[in-house]
């Protein structure tokens, strides 16, 4: 018997989790590019470490640190545990959270429970999620209802042509997607962010967004997790197309290119952000916030405490980076910038 589409989608979501927990899904040769930059160290800093302020505003919400838990999962039974552990950790630390794709909850009401996080995270910035390939203006009522259902503050639309091409029966028709995105941005009634999934938004894509009033862009560059690798593991049990698994725009390059073309649009830096130093460099290069996903997956399967511990170490390192560079807050950090190594 052929499984119904909703069941097949839930099964694929679970396979994504399993592959990310067990297989080598990071880029193997391509890096984020942040290693080519140095955060200037100031031996005569005039800051008090305990007074450094990491607070910021993003998509209408106040964050205690410029950190989002990146989009990961939804739909599978384990997804609900993961999302609630992530959300409770976000509540404790005052950071934001992106949900995994809500397409599954639009297709299957039962799957909606895996996205319910407001019970443990009443104050957290929660950003919903849908794929650009599936986005249609006719979906706006259902999409708005899905966002209402989870108490989201906004929506992230993920664009992922390479991932979809690697996926069995992926949605590979992106023709007309920009006009559909504009229609949804104009009519949804929620702030809309555009994001990649880890292969990068660069100059050519940013130029297409100049006249599209998105609330933010997550450059989601290459150098961290490769969804082209994940989908090949899911589909073939191996990486059959290694060149495609290594294709993307490094995060540092993506951030620089998009900031140059969209100087006034808030940017999220994600894709291989693994340390507080990575975050400090990204913020100094113009990102408003950073997002972290796969490093938090195993902790989220374990417990809320494991997620809090991981994020607290990350935030503590970021705090020391500001202090050591002589920056009392994020604005001062951006004024200092970074130095490109020879």
Swiss-Prot record:
Gene3D superfamilies: Aldolase class I. This is Isopentenyl-diphosphate delta-isomerase. It is found in: Cytoplasm. SUPFAM superfamilies: FMN-linked oxidoreductases. Substrate binds at residues 12-13, 101-103, 163. Its main location: cytoplasm. FMN binds at residues 71-73, 101, 129, 195, 225, 272-274, 293-294. Mg(2+) binds at residue 164. GO terms for cellular component: cytoplasm. Homooctamer. Dimer of tetramers. Its cofactor is FMN; NADPH; Mg(2+). GO terms for molecular function: FMN binding; isopentenyl-diphosphate delta-isomerase activity; magnesium ion binding; NADPH binding; oxidoreductase activity. Involved in the biosynthesis of isoprenoids. Catalyzes the 1,3-allylic rearrangement of the homoallylic substrate isopentenyl (IPP) to its allylic isomer, dimethylallyl diphosphate (DMAPP). The gene is fni. Keywords: Cytoplasm, Flavoprotein, FMN, Isomerase, Isoprene biosynthesis, Magnesium, Metal-binding, NADP. Its EC number is 5.3.3.2. Signal peptide: none annotated. One of its GO terms (biological process) is isoprenoid biosynthetic process. Disulfide bonds: none annotated. It catalyses: isopentenyl diphosphate = dimethylallyl diphosphate. InterPro entries: Aldolase_TIM (IPR013785), FMN-dep_DH (IPR000262), IPdP_isomerase (IPR011179). Belongs to the IPP isomerase type 2 family.
């Amino acid at each position: 018997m052929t499984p119904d589409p909703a069941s097949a989608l839930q099964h694929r979501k679970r396979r994504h989790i399993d592959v990310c927990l067990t297989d080598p899904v990071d880029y193997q040769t391509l890096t984020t590019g942040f290693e080519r930059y140095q955060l200037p160290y100031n031996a005569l800093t005039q800051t008090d470490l305990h007074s450094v302020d990491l607070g910021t505003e993003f998509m209408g919400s106040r964050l205690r640190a410029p950190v989002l838990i990146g989009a990961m999962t939804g739909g599978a039974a384990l997804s609900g545990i993961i999302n609630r552990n992530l959300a409770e950790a976000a509540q404790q630390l005052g950071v934001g959270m992106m949900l995994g794709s809500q397409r599954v909850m639009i297709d299957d009401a039962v799957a909606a429970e895996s996205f319910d996080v407001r019970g443990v995270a009443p104050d957290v910035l929660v950003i919903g999620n849908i794929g650009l390939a599936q986005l249609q203006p006719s979906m706006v009522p259902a999409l708005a209802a899905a966002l209402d259902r989870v108490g989201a503050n906004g929506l992230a639309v993920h664009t992922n042509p390479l991932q979809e091409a690697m996926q069995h029966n992926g949605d590979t028709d992106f023709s007309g997607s920009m006009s559909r995105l504009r229609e949804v941005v104009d009519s949804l009634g929620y702030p809309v962010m555009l994001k990649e999934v880890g292969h990068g938004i660069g100059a050519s894509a940013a130029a297409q967004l100049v006249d599209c009033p998105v609330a933010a862009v997550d450059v989601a560059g290459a150098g961290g997790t490769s969804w082209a690798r994940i989908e090949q593991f899911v589909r073939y049990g191996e990486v059959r197309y290694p060149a495609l698994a290594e294709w993307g725009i490094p995060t540092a390059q993506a951030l620089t290119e998009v900031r140059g073309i969209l100087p006034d649009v808030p940017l999220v830096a994600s894709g291989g952000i693994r340390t507080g130093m990575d975050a400090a460099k990204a913020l100094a290069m113009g990102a408003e916030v950073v997002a972290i996903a796969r490093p938090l997956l195993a902790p989220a399967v374990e417990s809320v405490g494991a997620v809090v511990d991981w994020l607290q170490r990350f935030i503590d390192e970021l705090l020391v980076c500001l202090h050591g560079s002589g920056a009392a807050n994020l604005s001062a950090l951006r004024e200092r910038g970074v130095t490109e190594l020879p």
